[in-house]
C-alpha cells in the first residue's frame, strides 16, 4: 500500500475508533443515569463500564461538564430534536404551539427516565450536570419568550395577558415536570398529554376568536 494511502487509512481507522469510544462512553453515561439517578455521576464508573481509562474521557470530552454537555446534545438528537426544530419553524404560530408541544412531549416520552435523572441530578451536581441542564433551560426560556411574542404579534392573546405572563404560562406547560406528572402520577399516554397541554394553552392564553372548536 502506498504511504499516502496508508496514512489516510490509518487516519480513518483512528477516527472510527475514536467515534466508537465516544459512543461507548455516552452509552455508559446513559446507563449510569438510569441505574443510579440519585447519585452524582462517577467518571470512574463511566470509564469502567465503557471499557476505557478515565484519562480517555478527559481526552475526548475535556471535563466532566464537557461530557455531560455532549451527552445532553446526543440525548436531544436521539429523542427527537429534529422534529421539534421543524415544528417550531412553522409560519402559523398556532401550529408552532401545537406541533412544538407534540414534539416536546414525544422527546420526553422517548427518554423519560433519563430526562428525570438529569433534572434531579442537576441539583446534586450543579457544577457538571447542572451546566448541561441550565443550557437546556436557557434555550427553552428563549423559545418561550419568542413564542409568547409571536402570539402577541398575531393578536391571539386574550385581554389582560401580557407577553411576559404568556411566557411564564408556556414555561410551566412545556416543562418536563408537567409532562412527568401527567405521565407518572396521572397515567396519561404521550399523545393524551400533548392534547391536554395544547387545550390548556388555548384556554389560558388565546382570545375567543383564536380558539378553534373541538371536533
Indicate residue ranges for each PLM-predicted region.
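Residues in the recognition helix of alpha-helical DNA-binding motifs
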Residues: 60-61, 70, 147, 196
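Short, basic, alpha-helical segments at the C-terminal edge of helix-turn-helix-like DNA-binding modules
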Residues: 43-45, 72-80
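Key DNA-contact positions within bacterial/archaeal DNA-binding proteins
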Residues: 55
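Hydrophobic/aromatic-rich alpha-helical bundle segments in the mid-to-C-terminal region
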Residues: 152-200, 208-215
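Amphipathic alpha-helical packing segments from all-alpha helical-bundle domains
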Residues: 106-119, 128-154, 164-168, 195, ...
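Hydrophobic alpha-helical connector segments
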Residues: 70, 83-110, 167
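Basic, helix-initiating cap at the start of DNA-binding domains
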Residues: 1-51, 59-60, 65-66
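Alpha-helical DNA-contacting segments of helix-turn-helix folds
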Residues: 33, 68-75
